[in-house]
Amino acid sequence: VVEEAKSHGLIVHMDGARLLNAVAKTGISPERYARDVDTVWIDFSKGLGAPCGAVLAGSADFCRQAWRQKQALGGAMRQSGVLAAACIYALDNHMEQQSIDNDLAASIGERIVELPLVANMLPVDTNIIVFDVVPDAPTAAEIVDRLKERDVLLGAFGARSLRVVTCLNVDEEAGNRLVAELTTVLSV
């Protein structure tokens, strides 16, 4: 993809929302993953658990232009040091969590794929589980609604596809509850 884009003079951006989960899974450094792209975005609020915050990285010229655009569009934020401190804390203290999230997703995925109305599942490589239900199962939206009534949140990812994301706020107990409630909902 990078080669093709660059052959047409295009700038290549990496949405690095899950970059650190990939790093935890493979041991490949973030620098290596981003080596061939022009820009990368890393979100601190997803797997790292910061309240908000992200970093956009690229060439010095690109960053100057991005900064100007941010200011022109009203993106200035006052007293952001407190949020920056939370991001630094997350980097210093939650990196190991990425492996825990990945392992938990794999464990949950292994159990979900065995449920009778589950048709298939994408490979669970990091902390994201995407699976489809068979045509005669409730729709994804119906499953989401039924689980929400049971205080379990899951995302519809299409008419028959569902998405689960593990993160700092999802522990093994929550994973077990998800599988138990999903089993109940798919049995009705």
Predicted features by range, described:
Residues 1-122, 126-150, 155-170, 174, ...:
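Conserved PLP-enzyme active-site core in the AAT-like
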